[in-house]
Amino acid sequence: TASRSDLPPPGGGERTAGPPKLTNPQRVYWQDVDITKQGLADYYAEVWDWIAPHVVRRPLALLRCPNGVGSECFVQKHAHATFDRSRILSYDDDGEELIAIESVDGLVALVQAGVLEVHVWGTTLDHVDLCDRLVFDLDPGPDVTWAAVVEGAKEVRDRLADLKLESFIKTSGGKGLHIVVPHDGADWDTSKTFSKQIALAMTADSPQKYLAKMTKSARQGKIFVDYLRNGRGATAVAAYSPRARPGAPVSTPVAWSEVTAKLSPARWTVLNLQDRLKRLKADPWAEIGKVKQKLPGV
């Protein structure tokens, strides 16, 4: 296990010689669209410059599906004996071993281990006791229209803007949207409490539209404003990570101007995301690592 002082600086990339080797590269991970282990590794190589700022040196939680979508899957938050430890960092923070990567080879090593989804903490290895990105996950219940999800996302954005906080947005790769708030850092309790206050305010003002509890029985026709991603150890799917769902949808950063009723939440996939990235005139999240802002009261 690496100690804090043993870890190389971000983007060091000096730890390995040559790319990791894939065993059974033709193993199919998404049967419905014929995406193989090699295909997933190739995807990460192609989008590395886009995904790197959102995964490098951030503690990870991994959804492993060694036999592909539709087979048994499990979540892993700690390094495993089968992991390539030369490319997958393990980090001992007060006795807790975390998983992180620093290069595209690290991502490919995760592919080799059957990882189909990469989820991230809202922090980095440099300050694991401080949150530096909040996530509001808008998760629609049955019978909620996409237009209502879009409206909810814009309400989160506007409430944050009223507090002088800039936010960014991405598709979840499922049915919802994720609003992300970069900030200068606050302890986990402060971060979670702030995000909970936003969620509770929305449910108080529009109880017919929103709820802030996970209760499945109450979800019908409402959007769950999930603020629980903002506690220590909680995660949200990483920007540009695929989802272990039919079609291989990708959680895709978008500009706020793209967030309309016409936007399909699962529009971009492992197979077509590169086409979008080539057409973009600018990265919609270009400023996410440059924004300087503090949570209220911090």
Indicate where each model-derived feature is located.
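C-terminal accessory nucleic-acid interaction domains of nucleic acid-metabolism proteins
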Residues: 1-6, 10, 15-42, 49-52, ...
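Active-site palm subdomain of RNA-directed nucleic acid polymerases
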Residues: 157-171
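Short, conserved phosphate-binding/catalytic loop or strand-edge motifs used
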Residues: 171-181
